Amino acid sequence: MSSEKSTSIEKLTKYYSLQVVSQERLYNFLPKINILGSDKVCCDFIHSLIDQICGKIISFDRFINDENQRIIYQLIRVYTLFINKVVGKDLKKEFICEDLKTSNVDNIYITAISDCIISRFQDIKKELTEKLSTISSSSLSDFDWKMNAILSSDRINIVQENVLLLNLTIETNINDKKEQVLIELSKKELDHILETFDQINEVSF
């Protein structure tokens, strides 16, 4: 039996799959997967997520009821991030399990989640590679922006929030095609993007 183990992976955070400490708080939501009630339903949920990552149109209605709707939508976002991260870093099953264990996911779900990801690993990797290739062959050719003031209500008071609307013109190398992408950013989201750009700039120089 081979004693080979990938024990030399460097951890930049307490998780093998994360490189930015600020993202650790997102993984705090991973244990909420137990709301699904069984490892069988968990497997169905994870496979549905993987199908969606691979480009299929998936409905998650069968997992949702009036009581868990908010949690399920958050699980979709967090586990999509998790799957993309572990596959993007090409992590072995032991490290996927270790990350789930670190975030306090129950053992029965750790096995179910890791088995699902490993069984579809190459499908996910192929899809991520194709998406990366598409992004790499594209470039920003123009942009425009404007500020909008929107009103949001929480039934107690009404708050005016400034929102940045960023219109990007993306030029691809495929038939010189140009695409328009509209991004809506709150101040918090814009601050996060600018902070990320600062970090990238520091690494570059």
From Swiss-Prot:
Q: Which GO biological process annotations does it have?
A: signal transduction
Which positions fall inside the COMM domain? 139-205
What single Pfam family name could you report for this chain, choosing any that match? COMMD8_HN
Region forming the signal peptide: none
Gene Ontology MF terms = NF-kappaB binding
Complexes and interactors: Component of the commander complex consisting of the CCC subcomplex and the retriever subcomplex. Component of the CCC subcomplex.
Q: Which family does it belong to?
A: Belongs to the COMM domain-containing protein 8 family.
Give the function comment from the record: Scaffold protein in the commander complex that is essential for endosomal recycling of transmembrane cargos; the commander complex is composed of the CCC subcomplex and the retriever subcomplex.
The identity of this protein, by name, is: COMM domain-containing protein 8
Species in which this protein is naturally found? Dictyostelium discoideum (Social amoeba)
Starting at the broadest rank, the lineage of the source organism is:
Eukaryota, Amoebozoa, Evosea, Eumycetozoa, Dictyostelia
Q: Which gene encodes it?
A: commd8
